[in-house]
């Protein structure tokens, strides 16, 4: 790769999850594209190749963990669990929790997603797996 692309890649690696999300939104606005539409097309292609029926019968292996809501009295405890799960700093994790409903972890294994769901629900949060 060129020096310029290496520098861009290094900059992207240093972004927090919240900063990466903001970057995606800015790119979508600047170029008139949608990251969600592209992902949907990519995800639809494997199902079409297998005939569709088999894909529906397979068990889902990756889950998105979504914080739906939380008890106001449990906000700090929920915030701590989100920080532990995401590795975000205090400010970024606080912004994520306050933006509920919000996806806090994407592509988690079934075991990791269930463990995170139990941990957050144990301290007063409401979580769904998608």
UniProtKB/Swiss-Prot annotation:
One of its GO terms (biological process) is translation. It holds the Pfam family Ribosomal_L12_N. Disulfide bonds: none annotated. GO terms for molecular function: mRNA binding; structural constituent of ribosome. It comes from the Bacteria. InterPro entries: Ribosomal_bL12 (IPR000206), Ribosomal_bL12_C (IPR013823), Ribosomal_bL12_C/ClpS-like (IPR014719), Ribosomal_bL12_oligo (IPR008932), Ribosomal_bL12_oligo_N_sf (IPR036235). Keywords: Ribonucleoprotein, Ribosomal protein. One of its GO terms (cellular component) is cytosolic large ribosomal subunit. Homodimer. Part of the ribosomal stalk of the 50S ribosomal subunit. Forms a multimeric L10(L12)X complex, where L10 forms an elongated spine to which 2 to 4 L12 dimers bind in a sequential fashion. Binds GTP-bound translation factors. Forms part of the ribosomal stalk which helps the ribosome interact with GTP-bound translation factors. Is thus essential for accurate translation. HAMAP family: Ribosomal_bL12 (MF_00368). Belongs to the bacterial ribosomal protein bL12 family. NCBIfam families: L12. This is Large ribosomal subunit protein bL12. It comes from Prochlorococcus marinus (strain SARG / CCMP1375 / SS120). The gene is rplL.
């Amino acid at each position: 790769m060129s020096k310029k692309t290496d520098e861009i890649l290094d900059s992207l690696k240093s972004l927090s999850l919240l900063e990466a999300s903001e970057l995606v939104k800015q790119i979508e606005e600047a170029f008139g594209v949608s990251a969600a539409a592209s992902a949907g097309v990519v995800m639809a292609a494997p199902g079409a190749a297998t005939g569709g029926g088999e894909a529906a019968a397979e068990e889902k292996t990756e889950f998105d963990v979504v914080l739906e809501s939380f008890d106001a009295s449990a906000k700090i405890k929920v915030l701590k669990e989100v920080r532990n799960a995401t590795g975000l700093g205090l400010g970024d994790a606080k912004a994520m929790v306050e933006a509920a409903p919000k996806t806090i972890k994407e592509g988690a294994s079934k075991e990791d997603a269930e463990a995170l769901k139990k941990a957050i629900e144990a301290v007063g949060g409401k979580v769904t797996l998608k």
